Amino acid sequence: MTIGNLSKAWTVETWMLFLRDQSALLQHPGAHHKTLLLQAHELYRAQVIERDDLCDLLELADSALAYAVETLLEESGNV
């Protein structure tokens, strides 16, 4: 799955699949994070998830971004 061909009808399962897409995460961590945040808020606005679920998804997105930054720094030898 790439950022360019995302479905407009996301589900929680779609969101979780994109979260676990390590290739997209490491190639474009900022765009990946932004997409996760936007889609989590969209799921909330569409009343697919509740506020507590939104908080959980946002925390997972932030953790994925932190992981990507740490991994990329380690790979570049800057840690």
State the predicted function of each range.
Residues 1-79:
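Acidic, Ser/Pro/Thr-rich low-complexity regulatory regions
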